[in-house]
């Protein structure tokens, strides 16, 4: 996605239910960006990601859901997320934590962005980054990207059984993200 990182043996690596991910240190916080929590075919319900071998990098933010073009003046200042790479396979999340100890039992805060289910992303504004909140609140912070607008809420049920849940795909993504948090943090 255009970001390049130099990895070292000291970068934090954690085990998820699907496999290991490599994050990075951000001041006093450990950060893991763009972790896939689910996968789905277009207009279908999300499924858990398939397990992998080796270590996947969680060093850069993942894709945001494709967004409608907005032509209001100065929109790039108000909503810089429209310049982030967009793709319908946007079921990813970001985690910031002070501790890698699985027994630490820190409170977890999950950020589901606004936007009326048609706009927004987990990374649309610098204020959504969880490193400061994690550091000063001593909590684990998770921000979630999920399907929006027609990719997440278009009712295609009249076109057959295959699409019976299409109007709830975006909500199902959020539930899948919460399940991932429950299973992995």
Where do the model's predicted regions map?
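Non-catalytic accessory segments of hydrolases
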Residues: 1-171
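Alpha/beta-hydrolase active-site loop
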Residues: 164-185
